[in-house]
Amino acid sequence: MESYYLAGMNEASLPNVIIGGAPKCGTSSLYFWLAAHPEVYGSPKKETFFFADKVNRFNASANVHEHDLDHYEAFFKGGQEATVRFEATAHYLYEKVAREHFSNWPHKPKMIFLFREPSKQMYSHYKMERYRTKRIDMTLSEYIQRPQIMDHVDYAKHLKAWMDAMPEGHVR
């Protein structure tokens, strides 16, 4: 991983906590509860997707593949005085690029991952994709047979990758 931008990093303009986890596991609720605290600053955009493995529809305008860290720092420019600065991109649980970047920061952020009983997570995610976003048109049985769906609930595998990448005590 290239760390050309690390030298000029200002710790107070970057998050010291990152919330991730499987989709539909409570990251939005935790984001809003924490952001309401007067000593905590949540990025104005809950999920920045800045360190996603590839450019996708959620981070097309601001991502590590096309921009330097200044674009990421902009999410936290109002929170320099906050004790805790954070964002909550659930998908970072699965993202190799995020692991590589956060583990190479001089000041490693604390990582908090949220999980849910796998069958309930899969069902909730299915309902969202089928009925709310209308991204899929298949039965629940067909949906859960997709390899990526089963991989997304292999929480131990993804959590271990983060625990191997970050210092002890930084992953919860």
Predicted regions and their residues:
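PAPS-dependent sulfotransferase catalytic core
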Residues: 1-89, 104-109, 119-125, 129-143, ...
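Nucleotide-sugar-dependent glycosyltransferase donor-binding/catalytic pocket residues
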Residues: 23, 94, 151
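Generic recognition of short, well-ordered alpha-helical segments
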Residues: 29, 97-100, 157
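Structural motif corresponding to alpha-helix initiation and N-cap regions
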Residues: 66-69, 95-96, 156
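Generic structural signal for well-ordered alpha-helices
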Residues: 69-73, 99, 159-160
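Phosphate-binding beta-loop-alpha motif at adenosine-nucleotide cofactor sites
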Residues: 85-91, 148-153, 158-172
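Canonical radical SAM enzyme core domain
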Residues: 94, 118-119
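ATP-dependent NMP and nucleoside kinases share a basic, alpha-helical "lid"
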Residues: 95-113
